[in-house]
Amino acid sequence: MEGNYCYRYPHPAVTTDCVVFGYDGLHLNVLLIERGGEPYKGCWAFPGGFLNIDEDAPDGARRELLEETGLHVTNIEQLGAFTTPERDPRERVISIAYFTLTRVQQVVGGDDARVARWFPINQLPPLAFDHQQMFEQALQRLSDCLKLKTGNFISGDFSYEEIDMIYFATLTK
């Protein structure tokens, strides 16, 4: 996009975050990154970042996930927009969050993520920003989608038995 834009009112920045659930054959996990920079340096968060001016939100979420963890996923589903004015201490930021289900794979921290790591869903560390709220909504949405067998959020092949096991894991968190 070319040109200068001048607005008479302040406007927010837009980020994307990706809640990635991973199944290892026994347990349901979630992928977190340890932040390498401020704000919340050293804290755990979901992979995500600022949307580029020339990309749509799902592509931005996939790009940030790949840059920060090395993980490529095909299917993601929009979870919602997180808009609390004070959610980011840097500036007014609106986050569009996505979620996906995949198999646990090797991940590595990259870009501004020092570490990428899978955590069991019932053993999460304290999360940066409003990511605890994001996690709770994503877990409920995952449970609902698995129960109803709806949505386009699965990246990978799972048997019906595995889907049932993952569904029951969402209920026992």
Model feature map: region roles:
Residues 35, 48, 121:
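Active-site donor-binding loop signature of nucleotide-sugar glycosyltransferases
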Residues 45-51:
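Short glycine-enriched, charge-decorated loop/helix-capping segments at active-site entrances
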Residues 147-173:
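Polybasic "coupling" helices that flank or enter modular domains
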Residues 1-4, 79-81:
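Short Pro/Gly-enriched beta-strand edge/turn motifs at strand-loop
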Residues 2, 24, 108-109, 150, ...:
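Feature targets compositionally biased, intrinsically disordered low-complexity regions
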Residues 51-75, 80-151:
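Unchanged
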Residues 2-45, 58, 73:
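N-terminal strand-loop-strand
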